[in-house]
Amino acid sequence: MYEWLNALPKAELHMHLEGSLEPELLFALAERNKIALPWADVETLRGAYAFNNLQEFLDLYYQGADVLRTEQDFYDLTWAYLQRCKAQNVIHTEPFFDPQTHTDRGIPFEVVLGGITQALKDGREQLGIGSGLILSFLRHLSEDEAQKTLDQALPFRDAFVAVGLDSSEKGHPPSKFQRVFDRARSEGFLTVAHAGEEGPPEYIWEAIDLLKIQRIDHGVRAIEDERLMQRIIDEQIPLTVCPLSNTKLCVFEHMSQHNILDMLERGVKVTVNSDDPAYFGGYVTENFHALYEHLGMTQDQARRLAQNSLDARLVR
């Protein structure tokens, strides 16, 4: 079944480039940039990948991202991910990147963007992988900070397909960013947002009604609100669900409790994604395989999930 799932043509719509930084590349970049790391070796770092919640993961995620300094670093990060896409027959990807993670530590916006966009261009030309880049605002920072990031992005408007919203969800509702999303839409950006991962269903309502999103990232807690579920079904709002991430961060205690197939069978346009694959133990195929192993996903369900991902693309 793994080989069949791997060969299935699919798109990935929820993947943070910084979260694809494998320990081996992290150590290589640290050496290249002469950065001292707090971990003795790759295995020690892998051993640190045990999280009780989203915040514990984010603390390590931001620490790891510190090795990304040059345009070449961002190219190598993105290219390594695209090679994984090719190996797993991901024919289209719409990754996130978090400019504030880098600009806040003095890395120029254009350095970050230059490496990523060149790799995506090479991915299209050399690997045949379609792509669209999503600029994500960090929700634990202020809306004013997000506005500054949008200012930095506007000279490179054509490099992006959408803006998004990620990082610590609790206490940072989508409504906090309504003005910057309004402005982004007026500049021609599409919009997506993380909601309903650790945050309540109310955050999903806000993302739909206030941020006017094209897709909900995560959204698994929608199932707690029947009226919300009906709206998502009626309007066919896609959910970019990340099963291994959800279990690794204790959104669900065990994969056998995950609700993705329940949502699929109720008519929700759910998709399968890896979120931060280097930290959560798998890329897209591994996420599909976990659903097969623990939830008994059928080939028909896998086909529908893969087709949903292709249908929910922002870039055609």
Swiss-Prot record:
Active-site residues, as the UniProt record annotates them: E197 (proton donor)
Binding site for substrate: D276
Site, Important for catalytic activity: residue positions: H218
EC number: 3.5.4.2
GO CC term, one of those recorded: cytosol
Main EC class the enzyme belongs to: hydrolase
Binding annotation for Zn(2+): H14, H16, H194, D275
Pfam families for this protein: A_deaminase
The keyword Metal-binding appears for this protein: yes
Entry keywords, A to Z: Hydrolase, Metal-binding, Nucleotide metabolism, Zinc
Similarity-based family: Belongs to the metallo-dependent hydrolases superfamily. Adenosine and AMP deaminases family. Adenine deaminase type 2 subfamily.
Function: Catalyzes the hydrolytic deamination of adenine to hypoxanthine. Plays an important role in the purine salvage pathway and in nitrogen catabolism.
PANTHER family: ADENINE DEAMINASE
Protein name per UniProt: Adenine deaminase
Organism this protein belongs to: Pseudomonas entomophila (strain L48)
Species lineage: Bacteria, Pseudomonadati, Pseudomonadota, Gammaproteobacteria, Pseudomonadales
